[in-house]
Amino acid sequence: GLYGAVFAQEAKKAGKTCLVIDKRGHIAGNIYTEEVEGIQVHRYGAHIFHTSSKAVWQYVNQFAEFNRYTNSPVANYHGEIYNLPFNMNTFNKMWGVVTPAEAKAKIEEQKREAGITDPKNLEEQAISLVGTDIYEKLIKGYTGKQWGRPCTELPAFIIKRLPVRFTYDNNYFNALYQ
């Protein structure tokens, strides 16, 4: 993958002999792309490079030309479009709230109504992070399908990496370079 490629490049630069072995029939791991009808297609799903380090950005640009891309996905729930990651645009569409304080109050209210004080599973953790409404519409079905089991059977830590922002920024990553 990317780590192995960087390691091999740096070792070679330092005068070492390198042999890159990959268990797949190609190098690059999960970031591997192949050309299909003139288009670079990610074989293993999109992987978006992002960093806030100017040094890292300059380093990787020695080897490839990058296209500027801002990942700002949306979710379609029965014809209703919601911004991801969950942010003030999502909260405004869901509840009509305008300020971060209003959104936080709504989430706290739904968390309290659900009786959650110490989240024990993914469902409880998700409700603690974004409220019952967003959990029911945008997390429950998708996550259950993704993992092949109900959210109540999944550990809470899985959802903790989910970005939740109390700004109107639809950018999935906070990184300067994408």
Positions of predicted regions on the chain:
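Dinucleotide-binding Rossmann-like beta1-alpha1 core, especially the glycine-rich loop
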Residues: 37-113
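Short glycine-/small-residue-rich flexible loop motifs, especially phosphate/cofactor-binding loops
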Residues: 8, 57-58, 124
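Active-site/ligand-binding neighborhood in enzyme catalytic cores
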Residues: 78-82, 89-178
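Glycine-rich FAD pyrophosphate-binding loop
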Residues: 10-37
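N-terminal Rossmann-fold NAD(P) dinucleotide-binding loop
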Residues: 4-5
